[in-house]
């Protein structure tokens, strides 16, 4: 009974804390479907694979935990434009983040590395090609890495439609930071791809593992067939008149 009560208190405290951060930084009062469960899993130290539709709010699933972690959250992202958009959005709400990629001048690149060493950054975005370089591995070895997040994780799988060989090397980074929790996110993954992601990233090897698959049903998107009435010429004439107005 005591264990149950303590577990409930801790669980309730985590939910309260998450909602406080959600309101403080994003202005929302409640989470979208599955966001809360995925965040709870990550904060509980579970390796996690989450399949969520585009627009389902995947970013919050690692951004919220990053605010609680003592170390940095490294986010592997496939496109420079996505990194820039995310960092700009985070900066606008006061969450310290940056990216390291080929779009930066050398001076800015080295300054960003200095900020990471200082411990002032909560989220680092980089491409898999950048992450596996010796320079970045040496940089991350000087700080605490609390979470490794892989966005567009289907790129890991040779069975996926966007396979990128560099993504498979992320498993090497996992071995360098065994204490870091791993979160893999994607909007598209068959059962075969999910199994390949889990195997490649060694999800659940040293930590508990949880998998979440959200519904892809969009009630606001539908197909409808409307039978036409009247002649085509009449409709075209009406369109011409409306354009003339």
Model-derived segments and spans:
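Short, positively charged and aromatic/hydrophobic N-terminal segments
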Residues: 3, 7-15
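Conserved pre-motif I regulatory segment
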Residues: 17-51
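Pre-Walker A (Motif I) flank of P-loop NTPase domains
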Residues: 44-50, 71-72, 121-122
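Walker A/P-loop
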Residues: 45-63, 76
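Conserved interdomain hinge at the start of the Helicase C-terminal
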Residues: 224-245
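Post-DEXD/H (motif II) to motif III coupling segment of the RecA-like Helicase ATP-binding lobe
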Residues: 146, 154-213
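Conserved helix/coil segment N-terminal to the catalytic DExD/H
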Residues: 105-147, 157-161
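Conserved nucleic-acid-binding Ia/Ib motif block in the N-terminal RecA-like helicase ATPase lobe
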Residues: 74, 80-126, 211
């Amino acid at each position: 009974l005591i264990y149950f009560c303590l577990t409930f208190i801790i669980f309730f405290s985590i939910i309260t804390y998450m909602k406080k951060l959600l309101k403080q930084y994003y202005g929302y009062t409640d989470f979208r479907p599955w966001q809360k469960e995925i965040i709870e899993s990550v904060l509980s130290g579970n390796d996690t694979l989450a399949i969520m539709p585009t627009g389902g709010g995947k970013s919050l699933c690692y951004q919220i935990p990053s605010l609680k972690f003592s170390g940095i959250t490294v986010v592997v992202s496939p496109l420079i434009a996505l990194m820039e958009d995310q960092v700009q959005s985070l900066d606008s709400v006061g969450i310290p983040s940056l990216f390291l990629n080929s779009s930066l001048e050398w001076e800015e690149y080295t300054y960003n590395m200095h900020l990471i060493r200082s411990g002032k950054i909560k989220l680092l975005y980089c491409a898999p090609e950048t992450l596996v370089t010796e320079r970045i591995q040496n940089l991350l070895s000087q700080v605490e890495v609390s979470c490794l997040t892989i966005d567009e994780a289907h790129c890991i799988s040779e069975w996926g439609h966007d396979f990128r060989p560099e993504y498979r090397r992320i498993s090497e980074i996992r071995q360098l930071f065994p204490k870091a929790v791993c979160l893999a996110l994607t909007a598209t993954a068959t059962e075969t791809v999910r199994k390949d992601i889990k195997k490649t990233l060694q999800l659940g090897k040293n930590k508990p593992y949880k998998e979440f698959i959200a519904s892809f049903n969009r009630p606001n998107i539908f197909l409808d067939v409307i039978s036409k009435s009247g002649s085509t010429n009449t409709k075209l004439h009406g369109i011409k008149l409306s354009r003339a107005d």
